[in-house]
């Protein structure tokens, strides 16, 4: 068993992977990745999550809450329902109306992706303001937060693999290379 009964399950639903983490206070108990799969059912995701708890010897009763950040809306309710069945309480879903301490200075703050919000909040927590956060996933995102904790802008760019695939497929002489270190 782990420390106490204050663990939070954090789930980041991305386009390519779902990252699942368990946090006990300031201690990260585990971080694992599963493939994002729109064909999976609620039950299949619940089985994956429960398997992780067994693997890391964490009791269901030790989890006091869960939070979801998602850029894949079709999976939101599937995973949310699964977590409700597992923990008998609704997870927090990062989105409009969730208080983060971040002032989003955009014409329509509700359009800012939850991935960008959680990256900015994590950056502020660990490094303070001002900060520029770069997240290199399926898309590369850049978030800028000023010294007053205002989210003042960002960019969404093709990720490294998406860019590489595009260049290889749309150019005549560029060979496919590995993104892995030699």
Predicted regions and their residues:
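Short, Lys/Arg-enriched N-terminal segments with co-localized hydrophobic residues
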Residues: 1-6
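Short glycine-aspartate micro-motif
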Residues: 8-12, 67, 131-135
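Short glycine-rich, Thr/Ser-proximal phosphate-binding strand/loop in the N-terminal lobe
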Residues: 8-51, 148-166, 170-171
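Glycine-rich phosphate-binding loops at beta-strand->alpha-helix junctions
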Residues: 38, 69-76
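Phosphate/pyrophosphate-binding loops at sites that engage ATP/ADP/AMP, CoA/4′-phosphopantetheine
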Residues: 49-65
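Short glycine-rich phosphate-binding loop at a beta-alpha junction
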Residues: 61-71, 90-92
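A mobile "lid/hinge" subdomain adjacent to the ATP/sugar-phosphate binding pocket shared
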Residues: 170-182
């Amino acid at each position: 068993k782990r420390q106490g009964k204050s663990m939070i399950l954090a789930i980041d639903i991305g386009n390519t992977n779902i990252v699942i983490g368990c946090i006990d206070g300031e201690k990260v108990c585990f971080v694992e990745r599963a493939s994002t799969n729109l064909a999976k059912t609620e039950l299949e995701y619940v089985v994956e999550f429960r398997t992780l708890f067994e693997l890391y010897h964490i009791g269901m009763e030790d989890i006091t809450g869960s939070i979801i950040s998602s850029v894949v809306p079709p999976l939101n309710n599937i995973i949310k329902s699964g977590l409700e069945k597992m923990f008998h309480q609704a997870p927090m879903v990062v989105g409009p109306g969730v208080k983060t301490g971040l002032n989003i200075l955009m014409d329509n703050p509700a359009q800012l992706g939850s991935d960008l919000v959680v990256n900015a909040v994590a950056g502020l927590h660990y490094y303070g303001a001002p900060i520029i956060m770069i997240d290199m996933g399926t898309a590369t995102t850049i978030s800028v937060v000023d010294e007053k904790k205002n989210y003042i802008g960002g960019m969404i760019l093709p990720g490294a693999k998406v860019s590489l695939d595009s260049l290889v497929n749309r150019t005549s002489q560029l060979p496919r290379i590995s993104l892995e270190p030699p």
